[in-house]
Each structure stands twice: as C-alpha cells, then as structure tokens.
C-alpha cells in the first residue's frame, strides 16, 4: 500500500500539539511498515521536520515548490470571505490541483493529519484526523474570521473525507453530533501514543534546574498560552493558597505566546508571583527533563481532543492533576489521574494542597502510571491507522 501523507500545513515553528503527534505517528509507521510505502509531502518551509525520515526504508520525502504558497493562501482567504462553501471548494480544488493529481498518481490512499482537507476532489480514498471541533463548544475563543474558516473548511472536509480518525470516544461522538453527513462506520477511535523510551530515559535535571533557575520541586504545565488551556484557574488557585496559608507552590510554564499570553503574564506580574516561572518554548530534551523533575503535571484545560501531555507525564514517571473532561476521564480508566472540575477553583486549591503535602501518594501514582502507559505506544497506534487505511481501500 502506498500512503501519501499531506504534511504541507505542519508549522515548523510550532512546538508540541499536532507536530508531536505527527512525529510520533511517523515513527510508528517506520517501525511497523511491513512493506507499506509512505510518501511525506512537505514544502521548502517545513521540510526540516522530516529530515530523519529521508533515509528511512519505506519513506520518501517529497518537497514541493511552494513559492506561490502565500499567494494561494491569500486567494483562499478571499474565497472564505465570500461566505460561500461552493466558491471556497472550487477555489481550493483549482489552486491545489497539481498537488492533488500528484498524490492521486503516486499513492493508493491520501492521509491528512492536520484537521481539514486541502482540496475536496481527490480520486483516491482520503483519511482525515480532524482532531477537535473546539469552535462549536467555545466560539468565544476564536475570532470571527477563524470561526468562519473552521465552519467552511471543516464542513467541506466532513462531507468529502472517506474516513476519520478520532483520538477518543468523546471526539468520535462529538463529530457524529455536529456533522450529520458522517456515519459511525467512517470514524475509527485510535488513541494517540507516547514514545515511552524517550520520556523514561534519565536526563541531567540538576544542570537543567540551574540553567532555567527553577526550584528542585515544582508543578509543571506545558502548554501553549491559548485561552482554552485555562491557565488562569491554576494561577488564581495558587494565589489563593498563598493568601490563605502563605504556601507558595512553584509552577513552571512552557509554551509559546498566543491568545491568553498578555492576561497570563500580566496576572503573574501584577500578583508578584515570583514562584511562577515562564520558560517559553523549550527544546524537546529539556521538556523531557522538566517532566521527570516535576512533582506533578497540571493540565486544567477546558477542552481537548486528546491528552498527549498526560501520556508524556506518565511515561516520565510524573503523577498527574488534570481537568475532568471526557478525554481525561477515558484515560483515567487505565491511568491514575487526579481529576477536578476545570471551572471550580476551590476544588483545585484543595487538591493542590493535599497532593503537594503527600509525597507518598505521588510516588504510588507515578509507579502505577509508568507501568500502564506502555499500552499507549505509537507503534500500536500506527498498526491501527494501517488497518483503517486498508478499510478505506476496500471501501472505495
């Protein structure tokens, strides 16, 4: 089976999220290829992301000349502003015709790991990872152009993709509720994985703490500064703990500055929370060390389609405090997670104080999670993807 993987929209400047997911899945494909061939379609802009796959057996990195990419994007934006799905569809099909024809000619199936299809008239079976439809649940987190873009591109993708991958049962049911054109048979629930060996291999955390000037014991929240990540409830809970008891629980934040950055960083400064350390984007090896040295991972997100940081923490031997949202509840059937209502600051306060003071519970939870997270491997996920691709081929 020849699989074309459309990686053209992966942003090399973005750390984590879909990039971590794509890298893990590609490594899984490399390990379980079993004769299948993978064509990675990249651009001059992002080809560096796939350097390690250039000389892998069963892989071919195809770099497209994208000198007209910015022009194409501009034309697509104009088409979106027409508010017409039909115009956007025909525009995309025309602009990306050459790319589509190449994939149709060279591959048996086309897989897109980045939320929506680039064009909507592929002659080959298409499989899509839509990841989430957060805009439906939290439209307030999106500008009106972004909401418009998602409405049109996701709607067209829902109608034209042949099969879908969902990272959780919640995501599958969410897609079925909001896209009546999709049937349950078209969606395969394939959990995301974690490269356990990478997160379990010890890192020199002493030099790491020295370089970043962080304390020996801290909470870790590795997430881009987006509104749905819900940084404020964690910061406000920590400030209340300080106000009530004088206890200052150190927190380390990593991730790029996005829609909530000014509010988050402004609050830290205004409240004189010098025990909160914002490191920005950090190299992957440093992130592994931060996980391994953390007392707890804290993930207060309001909405997620998956729980990659939870899996990474489990692999690193770090216990987890996380919001009580459906994907985390699904993971809690296998892992020991300390869940809380992400809208209940007082519940989080109590949980933080209790767990911070009970180191024995943390050790027990970490051992349990590190033992059980091995069932979430990218190799296992890759096998399930290949089974989905074969289903799509049989159904054509």
Task: Give the label of every model feature segment.
Residues 1-396:
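Carbohydrate transferase catalytic cores enriched for Leloir-type hexosyltransferases
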């Amino acid at each position: 089976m020849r699989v074309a993987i459309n990686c053209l929209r992966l942003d090399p400047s973005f750390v984590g999220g879909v990039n971590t997911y794509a890298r893990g899945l590609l490594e899984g494909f490399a390990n379980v290829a079993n004769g299948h061939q993978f064509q990675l379609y990249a651009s001059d802009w992002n080809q560096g992301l796939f350097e390690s796959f250039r000389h892998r057996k069963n892989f071919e990195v195809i770099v497209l000349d994208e000198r007209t990419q910015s022009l194409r994007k501009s034309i697509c934006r104009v088409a979106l502003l027409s508010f017409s799905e039909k115009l956007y569809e025909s525009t995309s099909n025309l602009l990306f015709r050459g790319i589509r024809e190449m994939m149709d000619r060279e591959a048996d199936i086309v897989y897109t790991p980045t939320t929506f299809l680039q064009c909507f008239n592929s002659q080959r079976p298409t499989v899509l990872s839509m990841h989430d439809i957060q805009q439906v649940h939290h439209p307030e987190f999106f500008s009106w152009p972004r909401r418009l873009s998602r409405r049109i591109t996701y709607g067209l993708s829902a109608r034209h993709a042949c099969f879908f991958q969902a990272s959780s049962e919640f995501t599958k049911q969410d897609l079925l509720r909001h896209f009546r054109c999709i049937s349950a048979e078209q969606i395969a629930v394939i959990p995301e994985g974690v490269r356990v060996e990478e997160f379990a291999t010890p890192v020199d955390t002493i030099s790491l703490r020295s370089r970043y000037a962080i304390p020996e014991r801290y909470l870790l929240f590795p997430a881009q500064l987006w509104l749905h990540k819900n940084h404020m409830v964690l910061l406000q809970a920590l400030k209340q703990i300080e106000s009530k008891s004088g206890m200052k629980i150190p927190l380390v934040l990593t991730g790029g500055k996005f829609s909530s950055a000014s509010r988050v960083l402004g609050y830290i400064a205004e409240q004189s929370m010098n025990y909160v350390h914002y490191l920005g984007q950090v190299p992957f090896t440093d992130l592994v060390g931060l996980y391994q040295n953390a007392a707890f991972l804290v993930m207060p997100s309001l909405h997620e389609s998956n729980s990659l940081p939870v899996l990474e923490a489990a692999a690193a031997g770090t216990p987890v405090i996380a919001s009580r949202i459906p994907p985390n509840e699904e993971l809690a059937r296998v892992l020991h997670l300390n869940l809380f209502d992400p809208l209940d600051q007082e519940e989080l306060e109590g949980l933080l104080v209790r767990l911070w003071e009970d180191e024995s519970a943390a050790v027990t939870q970490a051992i349990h999670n590190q033992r059980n997270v091995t069932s979430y491997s990218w190799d296992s996920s890759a096998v399930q993807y290949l089974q989905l691709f074969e289903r799509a081929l049989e159904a054509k």
